Amino acid sequence: MPHFRLCFSRANCRKKGNSGKHTNPLLPYGYIKDPKDITKLYVDEELRPVVELIYKLYTEEGIGRKKICDILNSKYNYPTPSVYYQMKHLERGRIYKHPVQKLWSTYMIRNILENDVYCGTLRTHKKKTVSIRGKAIKLPEEEHFVFENHHEAIISKDTFNLAQEIRKRKLNT
């Protein structure tokens, strides 16, 4: 099976997702695939400090997403998700066809802060495609398949929950 194809059919992909296997070819920032089993996630030790720093700045120091972007862009030399994926593609001799954003954005920070994959949870079946070439529709959270303690966490569940509380508080003010 080619390493870039995780599922050959929608039914096969759904079956793997139902059984707790990671089926998305794009990995969450901070994780790598197991070379022997591409459906398993492992922490990328090179990127662990970036994710930890983002959560620390947001939860412990009370810094907002925009300020976190400014800090990452000026003080640290951490690659953005798209720059990192491009580097990994080039290392393997492949072409990265997606647009590359060299500076951190609030959107990237939000994606990291809102994704429970960082506390060891795998969530599958988040979207559904209605027709063959149709647009994917987001499904309600009740329909997601959730696998707690699926892989090694970068941050604790408590830290993740605190980040969600802070986010909700900021939305309500």
What feature does the model see in each segment?
Residues 1-173:
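Conserved catalytic breakage-reunion loop centered on the nucleophilic residue
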